[in-house]
Amino acid sequence: MTTQTNETIAAIATAPGRGGVGIIRVSGPKALPIAQHILGITPKPRYAHYGDFCNANGDILDQGIALYFPNPHSFTGEDVLELQGHGGPVILDMLLDAVVQAGARLARPGEFSERAFLNDKLDLAQAEAIADLIEASSQQAAKQALNSLKGEFSNKIHELVEQLIHLRMYVESAIDFPEEEIDFLSDGIVEGKLNDVIDQTDAVLAQAQQGALLRDGMKVVIAGRPNAGKSSLLNALAEKDIAIVTNIAGTTRDVLREHIHIDGMPLHIIDTAGLRDSPDHVEQIGIERAWGEIESADRILLLIDTTDNSQLDVNVHWPEFTSNAAYAKKLTVIYNKIDESGFSTTNHTSDAPYQTLPLSAKTGAGLDTLKAHLKSVMGFQSTTEGGFSARRRHIHAIEQAQNYLLTGREQLQLHTAGELLAEDLRAAQNHLSEITGAFTPDDLLGKIFSSFCIGK
């Protein structure tokens, strides 16, 4: 997919603000002439030159180190120049302006990584891993992003694609040469190979889901009546006072958010307004927002005040959750304030699809059990070695591929339908290839790279 462009791009590659070092990155056919203008010399490839950085008038703007990498041995696959000077925003802006005056244009967000992808220096999953590594919120997330950058995720996808290609060869041979004595479609060979691919796809999907959880985190919404202890639970999970806690009902009127980690698993904890009928217009707005957060939650923690015996029957008082299958499957009922009530869930067992936990947000009793529960319901394993970062689009692509594989197996088992199986295998291969960019619409590429930092 190697591409050539006549445009040379430039950007500040270091983070905004002041720092000890600031870097200007340049990529394209004019990188060497720009280096000659700025440095006053012709730099040796892959050699650190220390000297003055000057503008077109010969004015010294800064002093620092210049590195020149001729194509194709560079990050982008093009001629690349890096100017490493002092990290002041004024200095960097002046130097960037001099680079632009010498023939470059300002880069779009993610354009350096996009050129690296187009020049086959890395695939799409690796390019996305660069952004994931920068944005990692924990050590484990950073390690898995680095694994993806090194190609571990891509290699697994390539292996699946290669197996699908060989499987398609078997199937299409049986279709094209039906007179042959060996019928690959009915002798079990194709079905056996297909089952192997399905099993391996399941394994990759499980790893991708773990990687996406580390990258994106789990959205946990705390819901319940006013004064059920929602804000106290937020503070307990965050281990600091985020929300105001009082005995006055309706203290929390808006959504409060806090980002925390449990053994490396990122969580977005959201405290919401107490759910009730209220004549107060402002409180009504907060309650509407609460339901909006509940709708998009990965997990709902419904708090029940155990000091009020009239509220203990969840099915009676919260049919909005228990009778709604979409809510019930992601619902955990928290019986709070057990330090005051002496409540025990052993007296309130049921066959409900949701889990119940006793807890005291005030004293912390049951908090460790809740944390372990959250890790369990999301399938998080804090001791997992290796692994790779993944995004929701990757999971969707693998799920789509798996659906086609399962449909193809059904066609094979019921009808020995070679043509239909071949089409399902082709579709599965295309979905998997979207992950690495081997088969990707241009509009998706634009969307992915536009979310990157400028200079990356």
From Swiss-Prot:
Positions that bind GTP: 227-232, 246-252, 271-274
Top-rank taxon: Bacteria
Residue pairs linked by disulfide bridges in the UniProt entry: none
Residues at which K(+) binds: N227, T246, I248, T251
GO cellular component: cytosol
Annotated positions binding (6S)-5-formyl-5,6,7,8-tetrahydrofolate: R25, E82, K121, K456
Keyword flag Cytoplasm: yes
Cofactor(s) for this UniProt protein: K(+)
Pfam family name, one: MMR_HSR1
Keywords noted in UniProt: Cytoplasm, GTP-binding, Hydrolase, Magnesium, Metal-binding, Nucleotide-binding, Potassium, tRNA processing
Compartment(s) where it occurs, according to its Swiss-Prot or TrEMBL record: Cytoplasm
EC number: 3.6.-.-
Principal cellular location given in the protein's record: cytoplasm
Gene Ontology biological-process entries: tRNA methylation; tRNA wobble uridine modification
Enzyme class: hydrolase
SUPFAM superfamilies on file: P-loop containing nucleoside triphosphate hydrolases, TrmE connector domain
Ligase in keyword set: no
Sequence similarity: Belongs to the TRAFAC class TrmE-Era-EngA-EngB-Septin-like GTPase superfamily. TrmE GTPase family.
Subunit structure: Homodimer. Heterotetramer of two MnmE and two MnmG subunits.
Function noted in UniProt: Exhibits a very high intrinsic GTPase hydrolysis rate. Involved in the addition of a carboxymethylaminomethyl (cmnm) group at the wobble position (U34) of certain tRNAs, forming tRNA-cmnm(5)s(2)U34.
Protein name (database record): tRNA modification GTPase MnmE
Native source species: Saccharophagus degradans (strain 2-40 / ATCC 43961 / DSM 17024)
Gene: mnmE
